[in-house]
């Protein structure tokens, strides 16, 4: 009898009755390669694969929601809206405003070409990056970056005049070419400041550099052509800052006003209404915080996709999940959000393939 009682107790503990998840959650299923190699189906299977594959699948869904949204989708029309906002054709034309942020290492990598594609076809509306994210784009127009190895010894590379970015190598000569190219532009900017009272800001400087580089491989060139603002609040932190420093010894007086840019950046979010706003942020640090902070000015973004490998246990903004930004009012409580814990050089091209690129291909096909 005692054994029966113990068995019954243990059995009921181990085999506790489950709540049914049928119809509430997706079943975990991977891609079946018996059906052949179908890349769109493979990518769709990410949603039900689990772990970060599912997060990537969710990110694809969120970005597609950003791209599909129209003001006409909103069933309620605000009583105090303008007559234009009540017009059905106008409402159908209003799209989500997309902020894209990325760190410099991604421009050092081949992700630069993915970013250039998005800017070239005006698929994003506002860009925020670091100084390295600016100069690496320009320098690649002057000289290439090469693939090396993570394990190459620093002292050896230094003796050869080679700079390592992860497993990428940038010859020091590239920065010499950058100096030769950019210093005359600074001279001309200073002349325009003195003679024409031009007030330079970081974003105006970057537009000018995009114009001057005149190279279709550059995302800055396309941002200039498409009139997409590029913000870089940490302008002096990088080789571009070094060049400004060196230029100040040659001739002083060049002024770059960051206050005008914070007004412009925050204004991109504040004046977005009646549009929704979406954030796609690769990596952390300054671009992530700057975009989120601007969206706080409008009571939060409506969509957010973060792709980075940062962790939140150290309290860094870089590693924070979207929900932390909700607590600050940088993302709305009702927003569609996801963080993908993955190297963006892997995740972002796949995401673009299943979102921006697919939709552009579909649009082009419908026109032919």
Swiss-Prot record:
Transferase found in the keyword field: yes
GO molecular function term, any single one: deoxyhypusine synthase activity
Keyword terms, alphabetized: Hypusine biosynthesis, NAD, Transferase
Listed EC numbers: 2.5.1.46
List of catalytic residues: 330 (nucleophile)
Record's keyword annotation contains Transferase: yes
Residues bound to NAD(+): 104-108, 130-132, 136, 237, 284, 309-310, 343-344
Sequence similarity: Belongs to the deoxyhypusine synthase family.
Role, per record: Catalyzes the NAD-dependent oxidative cleavage of spermidine and the subsequent transfer of the butylamine moiety of spermidine to the epsilon-amino group of a specific lysine residue of the eIF-5A precursor protein to form the intermediate deoxyhypusine residue. Also able to produce homospermidine from putrescine.
PANTHER family, sorted: DEOXYHYPUSINE SYNTHASE (PTHR11703:SF0)
Protein name: Deoxyhypusine synthase
Organism: Arabidopsis thaliana
This protein's encoding gene: DHS
């Amino acid at each position: 009898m005692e054994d029966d009682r113990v068995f019954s107790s243990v059995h009921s503990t181990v085999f506790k009755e489950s709540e049914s998840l049928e119809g509430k959650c997706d079943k975990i299923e991977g891609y079946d390669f018996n059906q052949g190699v179908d890349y769109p189906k493979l990518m769709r299977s990410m949603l039900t694969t689990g772990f970060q594959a599912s997060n990537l699948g969710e990110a694809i869904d969120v970005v597609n929601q950003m791209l599909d949204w129209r003001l006409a989708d909103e069933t309620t029309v605000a009583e105090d809206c303008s007559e234009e906002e009540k017009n059905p054709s106008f409402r159908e034309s209003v799209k989500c405003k997309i902020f894209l942020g990325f760190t410099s290492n991604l421009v050092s990598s081949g992700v630069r070409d993915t970013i250039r594609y998005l800017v070239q076809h005006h698929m994003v509306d506002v860009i925020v990056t670091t100084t390295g994210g600016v100069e690496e784009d320009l320098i690649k127009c002057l000289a290439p970056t090469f693939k090396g190895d993570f394990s190459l010894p620093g002292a050896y590379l230094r003796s050869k005049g080679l700079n390592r970015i992860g497993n990428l190598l940038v010859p020091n000569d590239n920065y010499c070419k950058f100096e030769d190219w950019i210093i005359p532009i600074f001279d001309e900017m200073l002349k325009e400041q003195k003679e024409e009272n031009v007030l330079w800001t970081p974003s105006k400087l970057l537009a000018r550099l995009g114009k001057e580089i005149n190279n279709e491989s550059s995302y800055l060139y396309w941002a200039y052509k498409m009139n997409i603002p590029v913000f870089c609040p940490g302008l002096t932190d990088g080789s571009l800052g070094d060049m400004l420093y060196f230029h100040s010894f040659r001739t002083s007086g060049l002024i770059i006003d960051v206050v005008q840019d914070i007004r412009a950046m925050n204004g991109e979010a504040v004046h977005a209404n009646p549009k929704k706003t979406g954030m796609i942020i690769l990596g952390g640090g300054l671009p992530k915080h700057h975009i989120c902070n601007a969206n706080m000015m409008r009571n939060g973004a409506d969509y957010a996709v973060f792709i980075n490998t940062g962790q939140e246990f150290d309290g860094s903004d870089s590693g924070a999940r979207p929900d932390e930004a909700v607590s600050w009012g940088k993302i709305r409580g009702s927003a569609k959000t996801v963080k993908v814990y993955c190297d963006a050089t892997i995740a972002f091209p796949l995401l673009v393939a299943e979102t921006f690129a697919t939709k552009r291909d579909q649009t082009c096909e419908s026109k032919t």
